[in-house]
Regions:
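A short glycine-rich beta-alpha junction/loop motif
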Residues: 9, 13, 40, 113-119, ...
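Amphipathic alpha-helical segments
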Residues: 6-11, 17-27, 134, 168-207
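Short, solvent-exposed loop/turn positions at domain surfaces
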Residues: 3, 40, 78-79, 109, ...
Length: 220
């Protein structure tokens, strides 16, 4: 989109809510969060205690909350302070077998503190942003391309804190962040509802088929 008065290329999206104007600013991720690698506790500490965020929690949830974290670990003095994850923090996949998957991100949306593992990098919030906007932003094709080029490795690909901190993205005001995120959340909710309906209909079809053909089950 161009400004006809000055022939200046404006840094604005092609599709936008009408109440917003002005350019999106380019920021490195380090302006919004500080990065840290996760903890590597002994195996005997697993299975009890504080919830422990792993790569699977990043990949398998729309967002991460305390109750859907799979693993637990017994923490020792200083672990919560050093490796604690709080509401709005972003979690990144540090290592992957494929370059395309390295640096995938999710957001923690819970008031209960958790900790995170060694194959995860935490982006600790240090500036005001709308957490779910960053969840969607970091999954966008543009962001993924910028993150992937920071990955390195041969058989196994990794991304580091320094690489993530230098990823630069176009960021709107927090008011526009919230508006965009709520639209995407609404769409995700509709998708989840439709998927439940599809699952029920498929179950109904299986039940009808079983009832229709049960009497022929012993025939050859």
């Amino acid at each position: 989109m161009t400004d006809n008065n000055e022939n200046k290329v404006l840094n604005v999206p092609h599709l936008r809510f009408p109440e917003f104007s002005g350019e999106w600013e380019i920021y490195p991720l380090t302006d919004f969060m500080s990065f840290k690698n996760g903890m590597n506790p002994d195996a005997k500490r697993f299975g009890r205690g504080t919830k422990f965020i792993s790569v699977m929690d990043i990949l398998n949830n729309q967002f991460i909350c305390y109750d859907n974290i799979r693993a637990s670990v017994e923490v020792v003095d200083g672990d919560i302070e050093t490796y604690g994850v709080n509401y709005g923090d972003i979690l990144f996949q540090r290592s992957s077998e494929t370059l395309e998957d390295v640096g995938q991100a999710n957001v923690y949306l819970d008031s209960k503190p958790a900790v995170f593992g060694g194959f995860v990098i935490r982006g600790k919030s240090k500036s005001n942003y709308y957490p779910m906007f960053f969840r969607y932003l970091l999954a966008s094709p543009t962001a993924r391309k910028k993150i992937i080029v920071k990955g390195a490795g041969a058989q196994h690909f990794n991304i580091g804190q320094d690489g993530l901190s230098k990823v630069c993205l176009n960021i709107p005001s927090i008011q526009e962040q919230e508006k965009i995120a709520k639209l995407f959340e609404c769409i995700d909710t509709r998708i989840a509802t439709q998927n439940k309906i599809i699952d029920k209909l498929q179950s109904l079809i299986r039940g009808i088929n079983d009832s229709l053909y049960a009497q022929y089950g012993n025939e050859v």
